[in-house]
């Protein structure tokens, strides 16, 4: 029997010319994962048949996070209905939802002993509600098995979903609602063509309208071709939507078919973005070359909560 051809992870990118991949500077390099903690986390996830964005998106921090028993669960399968030019998650026609997945996620959270758990997903434009009810069921399952754990969701934009999708997630009461803007609006046609900048911004604003006490969070990548003024404008837009927490990290090109790295932003520039963001009123800022949405999310949540209490004069 002839060998089957390898699965093409990004068929929508196959026609694109290869983009040069510049050499990473020293401040981007990370060690390969080898610790026992990493292996234990991997085994728990495998045994529960769970996907993680850590693996699917090729996160550079996977070794550090998994060594500490931290992982970001990716629900609703490994296949995304979008084809963003920066993302390494597989694109194609997804499978049906697994109704037992919320329970398996909750079991893994309990087994890992997570005090703070991050749940994300692929985009599911094929579902009427974009997977909102599946998010809600997962939140409730975790609450049932690990009532002391705090829960952060990193959701898609529900752009093509029926009315009520966002409400379903918010009503399940995650502690943090995260939705990433990813980049400046001028780069959306090439970086995030299936999304709409102002729709995503409005989504974040609506979360606060639905539940003013819920923490909101959003992230952007730099090094895609934006300029400093564009980043500062995104910060202003986020603050106008009452976003509490911003993450800023360096874009890293997964393959030659993905969007090219325009440049590597220096650690000093990240410090400048951090200072600017705090000056604009964010309660929490994470801005480093290796910052990702869920990197150190548990520690960051504790600081975020403390910052709100201090602002309210209750520290």
UniProtKB/Swiss-Prot annotation:
The UniProt entry's GO CC annotations, sorted and at most eight, read:
cytoplasm
Record pathway? Protein modification; protein lipoylation via endogenous pathway; protein N(6)-(lipoyl)lysine from octanoyl-[acyl-carrier-protein]: step 2/2
Query: Which keywords, in A-to-Z order, does the entry hold?
Result: 4Fe-4S, Cytoplasm, Iron, Iron-sulfur, Metal-binding, S-adenosyl-L-methionine, Transferase
Which region ranges are annotated with the description Disordered? 1-33
The cofactor note reads: Binds 2 [4Fe-4S] clusters per subunit. One cluster is coordinated with 3 cysteines and an exchangeable S-adenosyl-L-methionine.
Please tell me where [4Fe-4S] cluster 2 binds in this chain. Answer: 80, 84, 87
Can you say where in the cell this protein is located? Cytoplasm
The UniProt regions of compositional bias labelled Basic and acidic residues, in chain numbering, are 9-29
One term of GO molecular function: 4 iron, 4 sulfur cluster binding
Q: Which residues form the Radical SAM core domain?
A: 66-283
- Per its UniProt record, what Pfam families does this chain match? LIAS_N, Radical_SAM
**For this protein, what is the EC number?**
2.8.1.8
Q: Where does [4Fe-4S] cluster 1 bind?
A: 54, 59, 65, 294
Q: Which residues cross the membrane?
A: none
Cofactor(s) of this protein: [4Fe-4S] cluster
- Name the catalysed reactions: [[Fe-S] cluster scaffold protein carrying a second [4Fe-4S](2+) cluster] + N(6)-octanoyl-L-lysyl-[protein] + 2 oxidized [2Fe-2S]-[ferredoxin] + 2 S-adenosyl-L-methionine + 4 H(+) = [[Fe-S] cluster scaffold protein] + N(6)-[(R)-dihydrolipoyl]-L-lysyl-[protein] + 4 Fe(3+) + 2 hydrogen sulfide + 2 5'-deoxyadenosine + 2 L-methionine + 2 reduced [2Fe-2S]-[ferredoxin]
Which HAMAP family does this chain map to? Answer: Lipoyl_synth (MF_00206)
UniProt lists the family membership as follows: Belongs to the radical SAM superfamily. Lipoyl synthase family.
NCBIfam families associated with the record: lipA, PRK05481.1, PRK12928.1
Name of the featured protein: Lipoyl synthase
């Amino acid at each position: 029997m002839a060998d089957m051809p390898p699965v093409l992870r990004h068929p929508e990118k196959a026609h694109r010319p290869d983009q040069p991949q510049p050499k990473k500077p020293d401040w981007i390099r990370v060690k390969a994962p080898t610790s026992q903690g990493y292996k234990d986390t991997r085994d728990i996830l495998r045994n529960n048949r769970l996907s993680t964005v850590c693996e699917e998106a090729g996160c550079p921090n996977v070794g550090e996070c998994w060594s500490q028993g931290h992982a970001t669960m990716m629900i609703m399968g490994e296949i995304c209905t979008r084809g963003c030019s920066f993302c390494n998650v597989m694109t194609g026609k997804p499978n049906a939802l697994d109704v037992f997945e919320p329970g398996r996620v909750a079991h893994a959270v309990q087994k890992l002993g997570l005090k703070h758990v991050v749940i994300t997903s692929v985009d599911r434009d094929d579902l009427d509600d974009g997977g909102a009810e599946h998010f809600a069921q997962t939140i409730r399952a975790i609450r049932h098995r690990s009532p002391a754990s705090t829960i952060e969701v990193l959701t898609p934009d529900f752009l093509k979903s029926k009315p009520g999708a966002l409400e379903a997630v918010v009503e399940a009461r995650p502690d943090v609602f995260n939705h990433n803007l990813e980049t400046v609006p001028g780069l959306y046609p090439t970086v995030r063509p299936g999304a709409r900048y102002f729709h995503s911004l409005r989504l974040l604003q609506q979360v606060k309208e639905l539940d003013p006490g819920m923490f909101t969070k959003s992230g952007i990548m730099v090094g895609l071709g934006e300029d400093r003024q564009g980043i500062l404008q995104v910060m202003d837009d986020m603050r106008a939507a009452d976003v509490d927490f911003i993450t800023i990290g360096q874009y890293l090109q997964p393959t030659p078919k993905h969007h090219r790295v325009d440049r590597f932003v220096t650690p000093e520039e990240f410090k400048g973005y951090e200072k600017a963001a705090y000056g604009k009123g964010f309660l929490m800022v994470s801005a480093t070359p290796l910052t990702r949405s869920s990197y150190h999310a548990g520690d960051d949540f504790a600081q975020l909560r403390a910052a709100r209490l201090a602002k309210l004069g209750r520290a």
